[in-house]
């Protein structure tokens, strides 16, 4: 199989690892020129149809025509930026995929479902309650209306080997300070269960979703372990790192309101706080019930994050 991945962030990079490890040919289209392990890298814009067509057909690379596209590009955490940069590129990718009759698989967040994220299943209607959620709902609707075969794999907040403190709320605000012996700073209710999807689990789910892609867009939930509270996540991270558990601090809502006019990210996070103020749970879907995919156990996720070594409490 020859896979084209658009974007080389935390998801695209992990996908390249998984696919190349399985013996597949991988081409990555990214804006930069940095290498991606296991992949051929081409610098360019996924919104450029001519370039995209040349890559997809093998003309630009003197390789075989691609068999699937994984569309993983993203943009700055801002609803106006998302609306300006994402729809046109998704449309270009779907147009080329329809021409070649190959499927497109997208990673997707829970944002388009609004408060439905409290118990998110694959047949839940779209009901956004934030500007970012509205953009995600528009993208999902466009996929459903396009003749290309598509699949959208829904994940919650992400952690994993390719995540950074800047790209992962859980890593940056909960895991990292707890592992350093400091108190975690959390959004919303520290005791509300909140699902966390590992990036390797999402990547494997996207690969498994290829044959399920269809016109009208197939929506699938990524295998995601039992939801835990942010307070519990902080305690677990401290334990694995061999540090004492510190006080978990709740970020005041007023801080987001005050910083919002000066920071697009803080403004958007203010709108997204509802996801952390109540339970946010992903219900197992077809990838688990039909194909048997299971999430990585939480303890394994913690140990991998801490470099493969949990600290024995008796030797702290």
Specify the residue positions occupied by each region the protein language model found.
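Terminal hydrophobic/aromatic helix or amphipathic segment near a protein terminus
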Residues: 234-281, 314-316
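NAD(P)H-binding glycine-rich loop region in Rossmannoid oxidoreductase-like domains
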Residues: 32-34, 39-100
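Conserved Rossmann-fold NAD(P)-dependent oxidoreductase catalytic core, especially the SDR/UDP-sugar
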Residues: 91-135, 151
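Conserved beta-loop-beta element that borders a ligand/cofactor-binding pocket
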Residues: 109, 141-164
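Glycine/proline-rich active-site loop of Rossmann-fold NAD(P)-dependent oxidoreductases
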Residues: 160-173, 209-220, 243-244
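Glycine-rich Rossmann NAD(P)(H)-binding loop
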Residues: 187-192, 218-228, 236-242, 289-291
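A conserved pocket-lining segment of Rossmann-fold NAD(P)-dependent short-chain dehydrogenase/reductase
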Residues: 174-197
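Amphipathic terminal alpha-helices
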Residues: 286-288, 292-316
